[in-house]
Amino acid sequence: MNKSIKILDCTFRDGGYYNNWDFESHLVNKYLHAINNANIDIIELGFRNFPQDKFLGAFAYTTDTYIDELNISSDISVAVMIDAKSILNSSFSVEEAISLLFQEKEKSRVDLVRIATHFDSVEKCKEIVYVLKKLGYQICLNLMQSNGKPNDELSKIAKLIQGWEVVDVLYFADSLGNMDNDDVVRIISALKSDWTGLIGFHAHNNKGLAVSNTLIAIENGVSWVDSTILGMGRGAGNAQTENLLLELEQQYQLNYRVNALFDLVLSEFTPLQQHYHWGEGLLYSLSAMNNIHPSYIQEMLTDNRYSNKEVLQAVDFMSSIDASHYNKDLLLAAHGGSTNKGSWNAKDWCLNKEV
């Protein structure tokens, strides 16, 4: 058991997929107070992103100006996440793009930047990593959709990143929620063959194994693990911070105070869960088994236009193709190319009527 673990709570970042990263100020203040009292090591507040063409809340951007307004204890490290493709696909050079999003570390409350990337974009992330490191930030590289990758591909990627000599923590993510304990052990072993630094793990709960997989990861040498309050996160959600801390306190007597989270869980996040309905269930289990991106399930479950039959038909359709990446057009195709339409027609509506 690695007792030098770090708990990274990413409630606002991952949970924001349900409310467009728009959390009420009273909840934010209560969360920050409880997280500090629970001795959580790191909070990932949200994404750092360019302006979007639709409304998104403060934690979709997590600007330094906004962070400075928050009452964050100096004992807690602060992280933000960037999606590598938002940098790589921008109209700017990598250095220009990052300069628009980040200032030097000494001027920012942010300590750590996590870069989320798919395996086929890892090599392109090298410049992003170097530019951010030069600004003074700790760097995590987050390998998305790690399950199903063969050992030789995992080792090759680990060796490549090891050669950069600037990444502080190499994360692997169960993005589709389809890992079991054996998958976690296999991936860690493959990464360790060519990576000598710290390893982190980000679990999803499609199969109800998020906490179990996280504990297995810790037992096998992972030192950074992610969680969210009540598991709030995209699709089925994540390992629940409170449940994970209960296990760690009971098994290893680590220095966390889980009771500091109880009121936050019951008073604030339980009503949110009842409203947004994240959590494990049949459809998320089916999506995990068939490598379907969880956003498809979340989209259908939160849209009352889709009947249960239509959702199951869409899952069946997506099970026969590559649906591991979210694409709105694919969701439409799964429903026959269009969403449900009403039958009302305006023709002759005003015929022989006074208007």
Language-model segments: what does each one mean?
Residues 1-355:
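Catalytic cores and adjacent flexible loops of soluble metabolic enzymes
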